[in-house]
């Protein structure tokens, strides 16, 4: 039903949501015409639109585009430079720039622009592992502690020690790719 109707105005104008964020994973194969079509939606909908760099998993290779390539295409297609936005849209990893129209869009380019030093994210996988970074296979086993009756204090100490293993930087586009598929990590 979602694909067959114009549900966006109902959802986006609803009082149920403080803000709606739409994440779009980028492809290096998008033509300027396709990007223009996408920008029409970005301009039309009262949402926070974020562009996410492709992240390879299970040994897959990086397929771009990088932040600089995507920014150049957006500037070319939208007719002008993107400008820095100082407003904050949450506490996540996105950097926000404004299109020439003034509409702010977010960028999450974890491969070509490391933000590890300010990352405040971890994920709890469906099998009870706390994943410290999407781009690394480093995980902390929480489920074993819980199943073995660990106290809340012991669990908190384990989590704190694990968080200290978070890296300040990753190795960039050429780094080893995580082996766990995204569908097993959760999002």
Regions flagged by a language model, labelled:
Residues 117-187:
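Flexible mid-to-C-terminal extensions adjoining Fe-S/redox cofactors in radical SAM and related proteins
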Residues 4, 26, 134:
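Small/polar loops that bind or transfer phosphate-bearing groups
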Residues 1-11:
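Single conserved hydrophobic/aromatic residue that forms the stacking wall/gate
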Residues 99-127:
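Active-site oxyanion/phosphate-handling segment shared across diverse enzymes
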Residues 10-11, 51, 121, 132:
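Extracellular/lumenal ectodomain signal focusing on beta-strand-rich modules
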Residues 16-106, 110, 144:
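Radical SAM enzyme [4Fe-4S]-AdoMet core and its adjacent flexible, acidic
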């Amino acid at each position: 039903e979602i694909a067959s109707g114009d549900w966006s105005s109902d959802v986006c104008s609803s009082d149920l949501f403080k803000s709606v964020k739409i994440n779009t994973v980028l492809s290096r194969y998008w033509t300027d015409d396709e990007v223009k079509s996408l920008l029409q939606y970005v301009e039309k909908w009262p949402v926070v639109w974020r562009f996410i760099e492709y992240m390879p998993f299970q040994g897959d290779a990086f397929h771009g585009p990088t932040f600089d390539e995507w920014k150049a295409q957006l500037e070319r297609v939208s007719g002008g430079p993107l400008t820095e936005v100082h407003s904050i849209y949450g506490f996540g990893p996105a950097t926000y720039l404004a299109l020439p129209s003034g509409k702010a869009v977010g960028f999450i380019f974890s491969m070509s622009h490391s933000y590890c030093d300010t990352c405040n994210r971890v994920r709890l996988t469906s099998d009870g592992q706390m994943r410290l970074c999407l781009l690394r296979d480093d995980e902390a086993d929480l489920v074993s502690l819980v199943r073995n009756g660990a106290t809340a204090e012991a669990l908190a100490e384990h989590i704190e020690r694990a968080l200290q293993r978070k890296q300040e930087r990753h190795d960039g586009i050429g780094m080893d790719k995580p082996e766990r598929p995204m569908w097993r990590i959760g999002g």
